[in-house]
C-alpha cells in the first residue's frame, strides 16, 4: 500500500519547465557604416539619411540614439520570400574599433561591425568569420510601386517647380476666379505652379520659364502625359538620353531608336534625324526646352559631365514596371551590347553609382548581374569604367521581357538564350543531401543526371539542377527501407546506400540513422519542405566572397529594427540578433538528442543541453537540476511579459532583466523592474556587453571561470567592479532591491543575482542558464508541479491568420494536458467563447534535415509547459492575453466559470470621467492602466483593440465636458483609417507608442502644457486690477470721449477696463490707450499714457487733475485672482488687488468682499 502511495506521490511531483521571459535592453549592436544603402520600397537610401528622416526620438544618450522610422524595407521572411515590411526603428550607435568590409564577386560590398551576421549557404555567419570563397545571399527580386495613381501624385509633386508654366483644360477656366491684376493669366490660359495648387487645376500642357519672364510670354508647350502609354514615350526617351544623350540631343545611328522616339510627336515635340558625316543625330524641335527640363526634374539628369554624373533616379522605383522597362530598353538600345561569344549582355558606364544602381533596379525584373571595373583608353590615358554583365539562362529570359527595339540586338538575344544552358549556381550541396534523406531516397533514386557530383561538392548545382532535384523528391519504398534500417529485412543495395549516407556504421544505426528512421516512421516530411526550398531559389541567389578587409573606425554606425531581423543593404541580405538568440543557441550545427525544441512562440531548452553547457559549473557548485528544462518566450520585452497573464499574476515563472553594464538603467529598465515588482515575479539581471568593458578578455564559456587575475588585467577587473556597482547595483538599490554579483550572493531570496554576459562572445550564458534553472527549481517547486491528469490551462500569446487554417491562436499552456478534439474555452472581455479544437500544431524539429522554421505538424496532445498553435472555428474575436482552457465536454461549465473569474479580475476599474485607453492585449492594457494611475490619470474607458471611429466620437463627447479628457492613449495598436478622419475633425489628441513609460511620459507632459494653456487662457480673460492718477495739466477733452493723461501707479491698465472713482461711482470704460502717440493695448505700473474714456464721465466735474481712478474689477474676478492666480501677479499687481479689495470692503461694509 505504501509503495502504491509513493508511486502516486512521485507522479504528482512531476515538474514542468519553468516559463522564462526576457525584459530590458535586448538590442543587438550589429550595425552598418553610415554610407551603406538600405533598399526601401522607393529605392536605395543611405542608412544615415534614414536616421535623419526619423524625427521622433525614442531613446537617447551619449552612446546611442533610437528614433521612430516606420519606413518599408525589403527583407527575407521565414518562408524564404523577399517581401516589403515596416522598419519601425532606426539606431545610431557610437563605435570605436574594427569594421569588416565584405566584397562579393558581383562587385557589391558592405562594411559592418564584426558581429553582424550574413546569410550564407551554411546559415548565418558573423562578418568576422566570413572568408574569401564563402557564398553570401543576395536578393533575386525586389519590388517597387505598381500603383499608377501614386506614380501620378509623385509626378505632380516633382514638376510643381518655380519655373513651371502650364496651360490647363479649357473647361476648368470657367471656374477660375482671379483678381484683376492676374486676369491676363486666365485670358491667355497660362499659369504658374502656385495657381495650380491654389485653384486645383488640371494640367494640360507644360513649359518652363524663369520668373524674370512674365508667364504670358509665348512658349513652346508640350502635353503632360496622362496615360501609361503616353508616359512610355518619356521613359524610353530618358533611357536613350542616359545612354547616348548629351545636353539636348542624341548621337545614335539606329533607325529603330529614331522610329520609337517619334512617339514623342504625340506630346507636341518634333523629332528629327540628321546625318553628320558618318553618323546620325536625333534632335528635338518646338518642345525641346520643356522636354529637357522634364528630364532633369523627373530623372535627375545632369546638366554637365553626363557620363560621370548619371545615377538611378527615384522615379524608377515609384513608376510601374511597364514604364521602368521602357527606360531600361532605351538605355540598352543606346549602350547595350549582346556578346555572342560569351553569351551575355553587356553595358559600360563611367558612372560607378549608376551601374551599381542599375544592378539593383534590374532586380525588379528578377535579373541578377555582375559588375567589373575595367580600364579604357581615352585621349591617350587609361580611364576607369564599370561594366555590368547579364549572364545565365534565367536572367537572359527575364531580360527578354524587357527586350530591345533594335532588331539585330533582339535577334542576338534570342541566340544567346538558346545557347545558354545554365543559370546561377546554388552551393547547397549539404541541403540537397539532407532533403534527400528526409524524403527517404537513395542517391540512385534521384532523377538528376550525375547527381552524385553535386551532392559530393565536386560541382555546384545550377538553378535548373536544383529545380529538377526538388521536383524529383518523392519517398520510394519507404516501408521496406524502414524494415531494412531496423534490421527486420535485408537488402544489400539499400544497406550500401544507407552506409554511404552515414545512417549505418559497422552494422549499427548512427545518430543520424536513428533520426532518419524516426522521421520516416512519423512521415515528418511533406510538400512544404520542397515549397520552402523552391521559394528560396526563386527569391535569393548566392554570390562568392571575393575579398574581406578589416578597417579601423571611430564614429557612428547604424541599424534598423525589423520583424524578420534582417533587411537588404547594398544588395546583400544582412541580419541582426539579440541576447535571446544566444540563450537559445546550441553549439552544434546539427540536431542532437535533447537539442533545443521549437514551440509556438517559445523555445524549450532541455535540461540535457543546460547540463552540457553548464557542466563545469554544476560540478563546481554541486548543483543537481531536476526540472525538464526551460521554456523561453521568444518575444522579448514588456509586450510579451504583460500579455502573458494568468490568474494571480504573470504567467512567467521567472524573468531575465537585460541591462547594458556600460550604460546602466534606462527609463524602460525602471519600468520593467516596476512591472516585475507589481507582478511579484522573481528575476535575475543579465549584465550584458561585458565584452565592451575596456581591456576585458571575453570568451565563450562560464563567466565565473574567466573572472580572475589570470585571465583579466587588474585594470579591467577594476573597471568591471565600478560599472557593476554604478550602473546596476546602485540603481537597483535605489529601487528598493539588494543586488550583487551572483557568486557573492548568500541569500538569493533577499538579494537579486547579477550574471555578467556577452551576447557577442557567449561569455556568461552557462552561468545565466544555470542560475535561472537553479532558482526556478529551488524556490518555485510548488508552482512547477505538473497536473498530469488535469485539463489544460493557458494564455493566448498571439492571434494569426494561417494559410489553409484560417484564424489560429498561438498559446502558452502552463498547466495540464491539451487534447485534440476537446473544447477550447476562451475568456473574452465581455463574453466566453466555446469552440471545438480542430488541431493542435507544433513546429517540426530543427533537425539534421534543416526543415523550414514555421512549418507545423499536428499532434494529439500537448503537455505543459509548452507553446502550441490551436486551430478552431470562430476565433475571429479572440485577442492576445485572453485566458484559455482546453477541456472535455463535461468540464465546459466549470472552465467557463474559471475564465470568467480570470477576466473579471483583469478588468480595469474606470472612473466617472477621464480618458480612453487602448492596448493590444489584456495584460498590456492592465500594465498601461497601472502606470497611468500612478501618474494620477483618470480613466473613463479601457479596451483592447485598434483605435476605431467609435472611440474617437466617444472621446469627442468627453472633451466637451473637459478639454483635458479629449485624448486617447494607445499602446501597440493601430489607428484605423476611418478613425483618422474623425481625429482631425474633432481635434482629438492620440498618443501612440509601443513603450509604456514613453506613452505615460508624453501624455502627462501634454496634460501639464494643456493645463497651463487653459489656466493662462482663463487668467487672460480676467479683468486685472490697476490704480491710476490723472496727471496735472493733462485733461485734453472733458467728455464723449473724455481724454486725459494718467500715470499707472500699480497694476496693469488695459483697453476695455471699467473705471470707478474712489467712492465707487462708475465712470465708464477705457476706449483707447496711447503711449507717445502710438496705440497700445495695455500700460503697466510706472507708465504715463493718455487714455480715452467712454461713458458718462465728465472730466473736471466727476474727476479732476490729481484724482485717483480704480479699475472696477468684478468680485468674481477678484476671488479668482486672489485664490487661483496670485502667483501669476506681479508685486505691483498684487498691491493694486489688495488696495482695491480693502477699498471695496469699506464701501460695501463687508470684510469678506472678494475673499
Swiss-Prot record:
Name of the molecule in the record: Probable translation initiation factor IF-2
HAMAP family: IF_2_A
Gene: infB
Biological process according to GO: intein-mediated protein splicing; translational initiation
Gene3D superfamilies reported for this sequence: Hedgehog/Intein (Hint) domain, Homing endonucleases, P-loop containing nucleotide triphosphate hydrolases, Translation factors, Translation initiation factor IF- 2, domain 3
Record's GO cellular component terms: cytoplasm
Residue positions binding GTP: 634-638, 688-691
Keywords, ordered alphabetically: Autocatalytic cleavage, GTP-binding, Initiation factor, Nucleotide-binding, Protein biosynthesis, Protein splicing
Lineage: superkingdom: Archaea
SMART domains per the UniProt record, alphabetical: HintC, HintN
Family from the record: Belongs to the TRAFAC class translation factor GTPase superfamily. Classic translation factor GTPase family. IF-2 subfamily.
Note: The intein interrupts the GTP-binding site.
InterPro entries documented for this protein: Cro/C1-type_HTH (IPR001387), EFTU-type (IPR029459), Hint_dom_C (IPR003586), Hint_dom_N (IPR003587), Hint_dom_sf (IPR036844), Homing_endonucl (IPR027434), INTEIN (IPR006142), Intein_C (IPR030934)
Protein function: Function in general translation initiation by promoting the binding of the formylmethionine-tRNA to ribosomes. Seems to function along with eIF-2.
NCBIfam families listed in its UniProt record: aIF-2, intein_Cterm, intein_Nterm, PRK04004.1, PRK14845.1, small_GTP
MF-aspect GO terms: endonuclease activity; GTP binding; GTPase activity; translation initiation factor activity
Keyword Protein biosynthesis tagged: yes
Post-translational modification: This protein undergoes a protein self splicing that involves a post-translational excision of the intervening region (intein) followed by peptide ligation.
Keyword Protein biosynthesis: yes
Residue span, tr-type G domain: 561-781
Species assigned in the record: Methanocaldococcus jannaschii (strain ATCC 43067 / DSM 2661 / JAL-1 / JCM 10045 / NBRC 100440) (Methanococcus jannaschii)
Positions of the DOD-type homing endonuclease domain: 237-367
CDD domains: aeIF5B_II, Hint, HTH_XRE, IF2_aeIF5B_IV, IF2_eIF5B
Amino acid at each position: 500500500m505504501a509503495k502504491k502511495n509513493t508511486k502516486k506521490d512521485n507522479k504528482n511531483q512531476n515538474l514542468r519547465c519553468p516559463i522564462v521571459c526576457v525584459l530590458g535592453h535586448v538590442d543587438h549592436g550589429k550595425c552598418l557604416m553610415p554610407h551603406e544603402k538600405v533598399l526601401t520600397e522607393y529605392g536605395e537610401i543611405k542608412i544615415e539619411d534614414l536616421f535623419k528622416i526619423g524625427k521622433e526620438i525614442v531613446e537617447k544618450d551619449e552612446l546611442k540614439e533610437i528614433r521612430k522610422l516606420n519606413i518599408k524595407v525589403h527583407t527575407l521572411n521565414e518562408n524564404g520570400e523577399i517581401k516589403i515590411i515596416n522598419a519601425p526603428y532606426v539606431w545610431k550607435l557610437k563605435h570605436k574599433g574594427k569594421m569588416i568590409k565584405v566584397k562579393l564577386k558581383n562587385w557589391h560590398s558592405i562594411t559592418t561591425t564584426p558581429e553582424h551576421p550574413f546569410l550564407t549557404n551554411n546559415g548565418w555567419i558573423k562578418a568576422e568569420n566570413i572568408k574569401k570563397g564563402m557564398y553570401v545571399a543576395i536578393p533575386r527580386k525586389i519590388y517597387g510601386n505598381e500603383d499608377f495613381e501614386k506614380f501620378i501624385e509623385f509626378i505632380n509633386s516633382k514638376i510643381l517647380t518655380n519655373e513651371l508654366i502650364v496651360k490647363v483644360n479649357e473647361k476648368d477656366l470657367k471656374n477660375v476666379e482671379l483678381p484683376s491684376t492676374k486676369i491676363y493669366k486666365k485670358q491667355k490660359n497660362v499659369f504658374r505652379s502656385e495657381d495650380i495648387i491654389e485653384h486645383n487645376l488640371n494640367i494640360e500642357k507644360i513649359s518652363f520659364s524663369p520668373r524674370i519672364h512674365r508667364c504670358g510670354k509665348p512658349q513652346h508647350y508640350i502635353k503632360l502625359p496622362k496615360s501609361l502609354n503616353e508616359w512610355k514615350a518619356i521613359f524610353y526617351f530618358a533611357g536613350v538620353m542616359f545612354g547616348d544623350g548629351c545636353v539636348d540631343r542624341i548621337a545614335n545611328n539606329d533607325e529603330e531608336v529614331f522610329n520609337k522616339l517619334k512617339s514623342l510627336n504625340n506630346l507636341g515635340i518634333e523629332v528629327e534625324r540628321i546625318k553628320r558625316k558618318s553618323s546620325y543625330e536625333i534632335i528635338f524641335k518646338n518642345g525641346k526646352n520643356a522636354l529637357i527640363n522634364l528630364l532633369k526634374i523627373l530623372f535627375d539628369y545632369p546638366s554637365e559631365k553626363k557620363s560621370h554624373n548619371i545615377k538611378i533616379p527615384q522615379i524608377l522605383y515609384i513608376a510601374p514596371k511597364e514604364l521602368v522597362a521602357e527606360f531600361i530598353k532605351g538605355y540598352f538600345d543606346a549602350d547595350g551590347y549582346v556578346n555572342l561569344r560569351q553569351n551575355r549582355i553587356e553595358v559600360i558606364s563611367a558612372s560607378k553609382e549608376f551601374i551599381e544602381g542599375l544592378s539593383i533596379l534590374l532586380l525588379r525584373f528578377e535579373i541578377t548581374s555582375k559588375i567589373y571595373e575595367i580600364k579604357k583608353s581615352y585621349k591617350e590615358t587609361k580611364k576607369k569604367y564599370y561594366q555590368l554583365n547579364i549572364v545565365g539562362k534565367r536572367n537572359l529570359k527575364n531580360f527578354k521581357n524587357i527586350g530591345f527595339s533594335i532588331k539585330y540586338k533582339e535577334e542576338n538575344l534570342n541566340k544567346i538564350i538558346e545557347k545558354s544552358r545554365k543559370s546561377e549556381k546554388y552551393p547547397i550541396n549539404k541541403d540537397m543531401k539532407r532533403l534527400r534523406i528526409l524524403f527517404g531516397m537513395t542517391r540512385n533514386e534521384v532523377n538528376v543526371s550525375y547527381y552524385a557530383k553535386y551532392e559530393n561538392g565536386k560541382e555546384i548545382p545550377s538553378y535548373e539542377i536544383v529545380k529538377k532535384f526538388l521536383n524529383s523528391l518523392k519517398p520510394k519504398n519507404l516501408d521496406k527501407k524502414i524494415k531494412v534500417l531496423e534490421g527486420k529485412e535485408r537488402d544489400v543495395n539499400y544497406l550500401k546506400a544507407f552506409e554511404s549516407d552515414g545512417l549505418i556504421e559497422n552494422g549499427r544505426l548512427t545518430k543520424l540513422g536513428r533520426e532518419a528512421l524516426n522521421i520516416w516512421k512519423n512521415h515528418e516530411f511533406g510538400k512544404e519542405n520542397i515549397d520552402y526550398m523552391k521559394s528560396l531559389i526563386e527569391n535569393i541567389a548566392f554570390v562568392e566572397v571575393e575579398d574581406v578587409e578589416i578597417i579601423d573606425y571611430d564614429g557612428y554606425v547604424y541599424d534598423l529594427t525589423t520583424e524578420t531581423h534582417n533587411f537588404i543593404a547594398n544588395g546583400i541580405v544582412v541580419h541582426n540578433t539579440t541576447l535571446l538568440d544566444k540563450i537559445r543557441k546550441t553549439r552544434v550545427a546539427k540536431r542532437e538528442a535533447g537539442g533545443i525544441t521549437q514551440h509556438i512562440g517559445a523555445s524549450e531548452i532541455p535540461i540535457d543541453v543546460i547540463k552540457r553547457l553548464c557542466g563545469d559549473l554544476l560540478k563546481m557548485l554541486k548543483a543537481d537540476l531536476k526540472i525538464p528544462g526551460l521554456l523561453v518566450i521568444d518575444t522579448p520585452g514588456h509586450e510579451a511579459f504583460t500579455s502573458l497573464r494568468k490568474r494571480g499574476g504573470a504567467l512567467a515563472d521567472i524573468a531575465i532583466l537585460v541591462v547594458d553594464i556600460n550604460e546602466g538603467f534606462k527609463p524602460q529598465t525602471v519600468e520593467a523592474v516596476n512591472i516585475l515588482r507589481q507582478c511579484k515575479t522573481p528575476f535575475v539581471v543579465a549584465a550584458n556587453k561585458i565584452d565592451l568593458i575596456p581591456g576585458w578578455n571575453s570568451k565563450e564559456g562560464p563567466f565565473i571561470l574567466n573572472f580572475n587575475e589570470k585571465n583579466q588585467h587588474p585594470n579591467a577587473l577594476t573597471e568591471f567592479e565600478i560599472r557593476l556597482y554604478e550602473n546596476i547595483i546602485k540603481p537597483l538599490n535605489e529601487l528598493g532591491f539588494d543586488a550583487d554579483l551572483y557568486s557573492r550572493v548568500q541569500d538569493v531570496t533577499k538579494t537579486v543575482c547579477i550574471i555578467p554576459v556577452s551576447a557577442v562572445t557567449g561569455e556568461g550564458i552557462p552561468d545565466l542558464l544555470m542560475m535561472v534553472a537553479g532558482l526556478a527549481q529551488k524556490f518555485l517547486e510548488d508552482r512547477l508541479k505538473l497536473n498530469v491528469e488535469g485539463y489544460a490551462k493557458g494564455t493566448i500569446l498571439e492571434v494569426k491568420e494561417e494559410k489553409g487554417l484560417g484564424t489560429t491562436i498561438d498559446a502558452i499552456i502552463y498547466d495540464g494536458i491539451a487534447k485534440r478534439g476537446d473544447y477550447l474555452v476562451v475568456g473574452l472581455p465581455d463574453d466566453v467563447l466555446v469552440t471545438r479544437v480542430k488541431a493542435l500544431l507544433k513546429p517540426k524539429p530543427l533537425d539534421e534535415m534543416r526543415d523550414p522554421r514555421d512549418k507545423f505538424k499536428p499532434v494529439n496532445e500537448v503537455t505543459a509547459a509548452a507553446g502550441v498553435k490551436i486551430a478552431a472555428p470562430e476565433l475571429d474575436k479572440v485577442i492576445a492575453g485572453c485566458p484559455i482552457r482546453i477541456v472535455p465536454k463535461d468540464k465546459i461549465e466549470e472552465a467557463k466559470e474559471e475564465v470568467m473569474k480570470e477576466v473579471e479580475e483583469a478588468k480595469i476599474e474606470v472612473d466617472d470621467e477621464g480618458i480612453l485607453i487602448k492596448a493590444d492585449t489584456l495584460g498590456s492594457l492592465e500594465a498601461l492602466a497601472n502606470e497611468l494611475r500612478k501618474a494620477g490619470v483618470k480613466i473613463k474607458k479601457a479596451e483592447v483593440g485598434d483605435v476605431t471611429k467609435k472611440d474617437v466620437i466617444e472621446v469627442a463627447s468627453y472633451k466637451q465636458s473637459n478639454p483635458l479628457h479629449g485624448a486617447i492613449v494607445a499602446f501597440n495598436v493601430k489607428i484605423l483609417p476611418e478613425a483618422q478622419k474623425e481625429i482631425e475633425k474633432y481635434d482629438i489628441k492620440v498618443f501612440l507608442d509601443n513603450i509604456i513609460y514613453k506613452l505615460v511620459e508624453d501624455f502627462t507632459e501634454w496634460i501639464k502644457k494643456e493645463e497651463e494653456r487653459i489656466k493662462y487662457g482663463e487668467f487672460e480673460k480676467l479683468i486685472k486690477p490697476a490704480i491710476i492718477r490723472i496727471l496735472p495739466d493733462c485733461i485734453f477733452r472733458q467728455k464723449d470721449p473724455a481724454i486725459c493723461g494718467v500715470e499707472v501707479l500699480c497694476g496693469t491698465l488695459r483697453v476695455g477696463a471699467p473705471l470707478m472713482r474712489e467712492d465707487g461711482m462708475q465712470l465708464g470704460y477705457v476706449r483707447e490707450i496711447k503711449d507717445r502717440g502710438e496705440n497700445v493695448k495695455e500700460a503697466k505700473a510706472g507708465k504715463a499714457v493718455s487714455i480715452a474714456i467712454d461713458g458718462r464721465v465728465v472730466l473736471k466735474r466727476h474727476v479732476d487733475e490729481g484724482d485717483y481712478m480704480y479699475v472696477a474689477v468684478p468680485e468674481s474676478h477678484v476671488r479668482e485672482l486672489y485664490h487661483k492666480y496670485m502667483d501669476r501677479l506681479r508685486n505691483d499687481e498684487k498691491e493694486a488687488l489688495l488696495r482695491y479689495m480693502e477699498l471695496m470692503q469699506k464701501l460695501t461694509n463687508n470684510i469678506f468682499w472678494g475673499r
